Amino acid sequence: MNKILLQCDNLCKRYQEGSVQTDVLHNVSFSVGEGEMMAIVGSSGSGKSTLLHLLGGLDTPTSGDVIFNGQPMSKLSSAAKAELRNQKLGFIYQFHHLLPDFTALENVAMPLLIGKKKPAEINSRALEMLKAVGLEHRANHRPSELSGGERQRVAIARALVNNPWLVLADEPTGNLDARNADSIFQLLGELNRLQGTAFLVVTHDLQLAKRMSRQLEMRDGRLTAELSLMGAE
Protein backbone atom coordinates (compact mmCIF):
# COMPACT_ATOMS: atom_id res chain seq x y z
CA MET A 1 0.00 0.00 0.00
CA ASN A 2 1.25 3.48 -0.90
CA LYS A 3 2.28 5.84 1.85
CA ILE A 4 -0.53 8.18 2.93
CA LEU A 5 0.18 11.62 1.52
CA LEU A 6 -2.89 13.53 2.66
CA GLN A 7 -5.39 12.68 5.37
CA CYS A 8 -8.61 14.39 6.47
CA ASP A 9 -9.84 13.79 10.00
CA ASN A 10 -13.49 14.70 10.68
CA LEU A 11 -13.43 17.94 8.71
CA CYS A 12 -16.34 20.26 9.39
CA LYS A 13 -16.95 23.69 7.91
CA ARG A 14 -19.61 26.12 9.11
CA TYR A 15 -20.26 29.63 7.86
CA GLN A 16 -22.14 32.14 9.96
CA GLU A 17 -23.81 35.31 8.74
CA GLY A 18 -25.52 37.13 11.55
CA SER A 19 -27.67 34.60 13.36
CA VAL A 20 -27.77 32.22 10.38
CA GLN A 21 -25.45 29.20 10.43
CA THR A 22 -24.76 27.13 7.32
CA ASP A 23 -23.02 23.78 7.70
CA VAL A 24 -21.19 23.01 4.46
CA LEU A 25 -19.06 19.99 5.45
CA HIS A 26 -19.92 17.31 8.01
CA ASN A 27 -17.20 15.06 9.51
CA VAL A 28 -15.38 14.37 6.25
CA SER A 29 -12.62 11.76 6.62
CA PHE A 30 -10.52 10.10 3.90
CA SER A 31 -6.92 9.76 2.75
CA VAL A 32 -4.95 10.03 -0.48
CA GLY A 33 -1.92 7.82 -1.09
CA GLU A 34 1.27 8.75 -2.93
CA GLY A 35 0.69 8.62 -6.68
CA GLU A 36 -3.03 7.92 -6.30
CA MET A 37 -5.65 9.11 -8.80
CA MET A 38 -8.84 9.89 -6.86
CA ALA A 39 -12.13 11.53 -7.79
CA ILE A 40 -14.75 13.02 -5.50
CA VAL A 41 -18.08 13.05 -7.31
CA GLY A 42 -20.96 15.31 -6.40
CA SER A 43 -23.45 17.80 -7.76
CA SER A 44 -23.06 21.56 -7.58
CA GLY A 45 -23.43 22.76 -3.98
CA SER A 46 -22.43 19.44 -2.42
CA GLY A 47 -19.35 20.96 -0.74
CA LYS A 48 -16.64 19.75 -3.14
CA SER A 49 -15.00 23.12 -3.76
CA THR A 50 -15.10 24.05 -0.08
CA LEU A 51 -13.34 20.77 0.67
CA LEU A 52 -10.56 21.53 -1.81
CA HIS A 53 -10.02 24.96 -0.26
CA LEU A 54 -9.52 23.30 3.13
CA LEU A 55 -7.19 20.66 1.70
CA GLY A 56 -5.05 23.35 0.10
CA GLY A 57 -4.83 25.46 3.23
CA LEU A 58 -6.79 28.27 1.56
CA ASP A 59 -9.44 28.15 4.28
CA THR A 60 -9.60 26.89 7.86
CA PRO A 61 -11.97 24.13 9.02
CA THR A 62 -14.40 24.83 11.84
CA SER A 63 -13.24 21.56 13.37
CA GLY A 64 -11.11 18.60 12.33
CA ASP A 65 -7.77 18.81 10.57
CA VAL A 66 -5.93 18.19 7.32
CA ILE A 67 -2.65 16.29 7.63
CA PHE A 68 -0.20 16.56 4.73
CA ASN A 69 2.82 14.23 4.75
CA GLY A 70 2.36 13.69 8.49
CA GLN A 71 2.14 17.40 9.30
CA PRO A 72 -1.15 18.92 10.57
CA MET A 73 -2.13 22.03 8.60
CA SER A 74 -3.45 23.57 11.81
CA LYS A 75 0.13 23.76 13.10
CA LEU A 76 1.46 25.65 10.06
CA SER A 77 1.88 29.41 9.86
CA SER A 78 0.46 31.33 6.90
CA ALA A 79 3.96 31.55 5.42
CA ALA A 80 4.50 27.80 5.81
CA LYS A 81 1.16 27.09 4.11
CA ALA A 82 2.11 29.38 1.23
CA GLU A 83 5.42 27.55 0.82
CA LEU A 84 3.61 24.20 0.91
CA ARG A 85 1.26 25.37 -1.85
CA ASN A 86 4.18 26.56 -3.95
CA GLN A 87 6.39 23.49 -3.51
CA LYS A 88 4.23 20.44 -2.75
CA LEU A 89 0.69 21.21 -3.96
CA GLY A 90 -0.60 22.09 -7.42
CA PHE A 91 -3.99 23.58 -8.26
CA ILE A 92 -6.13 23.28 -11.40
CA TYR A 93 -9.46 25.07 -11.68
CA GLN A 94 -12.43 25.02 -14.05
CA PHE A 95 -11.25 28.42 -15.33
CA HIS A 96 -7.58 28.52 -16.25
CA HIS A 97 -6.73 31.78 -14.38
CA LEU A 98 -3.82 32.51 -16.72
CA LEU A 99 -2.38 36.03 -16.64
CA PRO A 100 -3.60 37.61 -19.91
CA ASP A 101 -0.58 39.86 -20.55
CA PHE A 102 1.96 37.04 -20.18
CA THR A 103 2.89 34.30 -22.63
CA ALA A 104 2.23 30.63 -22.03
CA LEU A 105 5.88 30.17 -21.06
CA GLU A 106 5.77 33.08 -18.61
CA ASN A 107 2.55 31.81 -17.03
CA VAL A 108 4.04 28.36 -16.49
CA ALA A 109 7.20 29.92 -15.05
CA MET A 110 5.33 31.97 -12.43
CA PRO A 111 5.47 29.39 -9.57
CA LEU A 112 9.21 29.01 -10.19
CA LEU A 113 9.69 32.78 -9.95
CA ILE A 114 7.73 32.84 -6.71
CA GLY A 115 9.89 29.97 -5.46
CA LYS A 116 13.01 32.04 -6.31
CA LYS A 117 14.54 29.45 -8.61
CA LYS A 118 17.57 30.38 -10.75
CA PRO A 119 16.71 32.12 -14.07
CA ALA A 120 18.25 29.39 -16.24
CA GLU A 121 16.34 26.71 -14.34
CA ILE A 122 13.10 28.67 -14.60
CA ASN A 123 13.17 28.89 -18.39
CA SER A 124 14.27 25.29 -19.01
CA ARG A 125 11.80 23.78 -16.55
CA ALA A 126 8.85 25.85 -17.82
CA LEU A 127 9.65 24.87 -21.40
CA GLU A 128 10.00 21.22 -20.33
CA MET A 129 6.48 21.29 -18.86
CA LEU A 130 5.00 22.95 -21.95
CA LYS A 131 6.58 20.14 -23.97
CA ALA A 132 5.07 17.58 -21.59
CA VAL A 133 1.58 18.94 -22.34
CA GLY A 134 2.27 19.20 -26.08
CA LEU A 135 2.47 22.99 -26.31
CA GLU A 136 6.14 23.90 -26.64
CA HIS A 137 5.30 25.38 -30.07
CA ARG A 138 2.87 27.80 -28.37
CA ALA A 139 5.33 29.00 -25.71
CA ASN A 140 5.32 32.63 -26.89
CA HIS A 141 1.55 32.93 -27.37
CA ARG A 142 -0.68 34.79 -24.93
CA PRO A 143 -3.86 33.15 -23.54
CA SER A 144 -6.06 35.11 -25.98
CA GLU A 145 -4.22 33.38 -28.83
CA LEU A 146 -4.86 29.88 -27.47
CA SER A 147 -7.91 27.62 -27.68
CA GLY A 148 -9.84 26.63 -24.55
CA GLY A 149 -8.17 23.23 -24.45
CA GLU A 150 -4.73 24.77 -24.94
CA ARG A 151 -5.30 27.28 -22.12
CA GLN A 152 -6.22 24.46 -19.75
CA ARG A 153 -3.11 22.54 -20.79
CA VAL A 154 -1.00 25.58 -19.94
CA ALA A 155 -2.74 25.74 -16.54
CA ILE A 156 -1.89 22.07 -15.97
CA ALA A 157 1.75 22.70 -16.90
CA ARG A 158 1.82 25.58 -14.41
CA ALA A 159 0.33 23.36 -11.67
CA LEU A 160 3.00 20.71 -12.24
CA VAL A 161 6.06 22.86 -12.91
CA ASN A 162 7.38 22.57 -9.32
CA ASN A 163 6.93 18.77 -9.27
CA PRO A 164 4.20 18.83 -6.60
CA TRP A 165 3.37 15.68 -4.69
CA LEU A 166 -0.37 16.28 -5.05
CA VAL A 167 -2.53 18.24 -7.50
CA LEU A 168 -5.99 19.41 -6.41
CA ALA A 169 -8.28 19.85 -9.42
CA ASP A 170 -11.70 21.54 -9.19
CA GLU A 171 -13.85 20.59 -12.22
CA PRO A 172 -10.79 20.84 -14.51
CA THR A 173 -12.80 20.03 -17.65
CA GLY A 174 -15.97 21.92 -16.74
CA ASN A 175 -15.51 24.58 -19.45
CA LEU A 176 -14.39 22.18 -22.19
CA ASP A 177 -16.23 20.21 -24.86
CA ALA A 178 -16.23 16.41 -24.74
CA ARG A 179 -13.20 16.00 -27.03
CA ASN A 180 -11.02 18.44 -25.10
CA ALA A 181 -12.23 17.06 -21.76
CA ASP A 182 -11.21 13.57 -22.82
CA SER A 183 -7.82 14.87 -23.92
CA ILE A 184 -7.23 16.61 -20.57
CA PHE A 185 -8.02 13.48 -18.55
CA GLN A 186 -5.73 11.41 -20.75
CA LEU A 187 -3.02 13.99 -20.06
CA LEU A 188 -3.55 13.81 -16.29
CA GLY A 189 -3.22 10.04 -16.41
CA GLU A 190 -0.04 10.26 -18.46
CA LEU A 191 1.51 12.81 -16.08
CA ASN A 192 0.58 10.59 -13.14
CA ARG A 193 2.39 7.65 -14.73
CA LEU A 194 5.46 9.64 -15.79
CA GLN A 195 5.94 11.84 -12.72
CA GLY A 196 4.17 9.89 -9.98
CA THR A 197 2.06 12.92 -9.10
CA ALA A 198 -1.08 12.20 -7.07
CA PHE A 199 -4.32 13.79 -8.31
CA LEU A 200 -7.49 14.56 -6.37
CA VAL A 201 -10.18 15.68 -8.81
CA VAL A 202 -13.63 16.91 -7.85
CA THR A 203 -16.22 16.61 -10.60
CA HIS A 204 -19.91 16.04 -11.27
CA ASP A 205 -19.14 13.95 -14.37
CA LEU A 206 -19.25 10.18 -13.78
CA GLN A 207 -17.72 9.45 -17.19
CA LEU A 208 -14.63 11.44 -16.27
CA ALA A 209 -14.49 10.19 -12.68
CA LYS A 210 -14.39 6.56 -13.79
CA ARG A 211 -10.95 7.18 -15.31
CA MET A 212 -9.56 7.62 -11.80
CA SER A 213 -8.42 4.64 -9.74
CA ARG A 214 -10.74 5.49 -6.84
CA GLN A 215 -14.01 7.43 -6.55
CA LEU A 216 -15.84 8.83 -3.53
CA GLU A 217 -19.32 10.36 -3.57
CA MET A 218 -20.21 13.58 -1.77
CA ARG A 219 -23.78 14.66 -0.97
CA ASP A 220 -24.83 17.63 1.13
CA GLY A 221 -21.35 18.02 2.60
CA ARG A 222 -20.94 14.35 3.52
CA LEU A 223 -18.90 11.57 1.94
CA THR A 224 -21.61 8.96 1.48
CA ALA A 225 -20.00 6.09 -0.41
CA GLU A 226 -17.01 4.73 -2.27
CA LEU A 227 -18.15 4.20 -5.84
CA SER A 228 -17.37 1.49 -8.36
CA LEU A 229 -17.57 3.16 -11.76
CA MET A 230 -15.68 0.75 -13.98
CA GLY A 231 -17.65 0.50 -17.18
CA ALA A 232 -20.08 3.23 -16.15
CA GLU A 233 -22.19 4.57 -19.01
Curated annotation (Swiss-Prot):
Alphabetical UniProt keywords: ATP-binding, Cell inner membrane, Cell membrane, Membrane, Nucleotide-binding, Translocase, Transport
Looking at the keywords, is Signal present?
Answer: no
Location, primary (coarse class): membrane
Q: Write down the superkingdom of origin.
A: Bacteria
Molecular-function annotations in GO: ATP binding; ATP hydrolysis activity; transmembrane transporter activity
Q: Name one GO cellular component term.
A: plasma membrane
Q: Does the keyword Cell wall biogenesis/degradation apply?
A: no
Q: Residues that bind ATP, according to the entry? A: G42, S43, S44, G45, S46, G47, K48, S49
Question: Which Gene Ontology terms describe the biological processes this protein takes part in?
Answer: lipoprotein localization to outer membrane; protein localization to outer membrane
Q: Where in the cell is it found?
A: Cell inner membrane
Membrane topology summary: Peripheral membrane protein
User: Which PANTHER family does the entry link to?
Assistant: IMPORT ATP-BINDING PROTEIN, LIPOPROTEIN-RELEASING SYSTEM ATP-BINDING PROTEIN LOLD
Q: Which family does it belong to?
A: Belongs to the ABC transporter superfamily. Lipoprotein translocase (TC 3.A.1.125) family.
Please describe what this protein does: Part of the ABC transporter complex LolCDE involved in the translocation of mature outer membrane-directed lipoproteins, from the inner membrane to the periplasmic chaperone, LolA. Responsible for the formation of the LolA-lipoprotein complex in an ATP-dependent manner.
According to the record's subunit comment, the protein's assembly and interactions are: The complex is composed of two ATP-binding proteins (LolD) and two transmembrane proteins (LolC and LolE).
From the Swiss-Prot or TrEMBL record, give the protein name: Lipoprotein-releasing system ATP-binding protein LolD
Q: Which organism is it from?
A: Escherichia coli O157:H7
Tell me the lineage of the source organism. Bacteria, Pseudomonadati, Pseudomonadota, Gammaproteobacteria, Enterobacterales
Gene name per UniProt? lolD
